[in-house]
């Protein structure tokens, strides 16, 4: 008897979760489809952006130079500069040390000097083959 009740509750939970997802995707439009562009549309939007300086490829933001391009998700990413003048965006470290990386003006300067913490210092060491 208890097994049957548990089975029924489990089945109802799974069915209701799937139904909720279906309804949410159908009636809220699942915004992701509206944001998708074909390669031609993307190229056309970038070519007609009106940017007279440098258009960042990841964010379509107009900046003075490529080194000023922001990461696509600045609240959760660090922009780390490479020795060749380019940059790479990586996820900010999590856990207890995450507060050290809250300020985007200084977070790229921090090096925890710990290969278990992936920050810009780690990227520099990896570039040199030290990791």
From Swiss-Prot:
Similarity comment: family membership: Belongs to the LCL2 family.
General function of this protein: Probable component of the endoplasmic reticulum-associated degradation (ERAD) pathway.
Domain of life: Eukaryota
Name under which the protein is recorded: Long chronological lifespan protein 2
GO biological process: ERAD pathway
Signal peptide (residue range): 1-17
Swiss-Prot/TrEMBL keywords: Signal
């Amino acid at each position: 008897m208890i097994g049957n009740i548990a089975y029924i509750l489990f089945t109802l939970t799974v069915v209701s979760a799937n139904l909720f997802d279906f309804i949410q995707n159908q009636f809220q439009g699942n915004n992701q489809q509206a944001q998708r562009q074909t390669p031609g549309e993307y190229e056309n939007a970038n070519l007609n952006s009106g940017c007279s300086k440098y258009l960042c490829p990841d964010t379509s933001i107009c900046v003075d130079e490529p080194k000023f391009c922001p990461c696509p998700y600045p609240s959760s990413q660090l922009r780390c500069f490479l020795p060749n003048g380019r940059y790479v965006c990586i996820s900010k470290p999590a856990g207890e040390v995450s507060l050290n990386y809250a300020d985007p003006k200084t977070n790229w300067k921090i090096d925890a000097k710990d290969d278990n913490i992936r920050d810009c210092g780690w990227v520099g060491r990896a570039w040199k083959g030290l990791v």
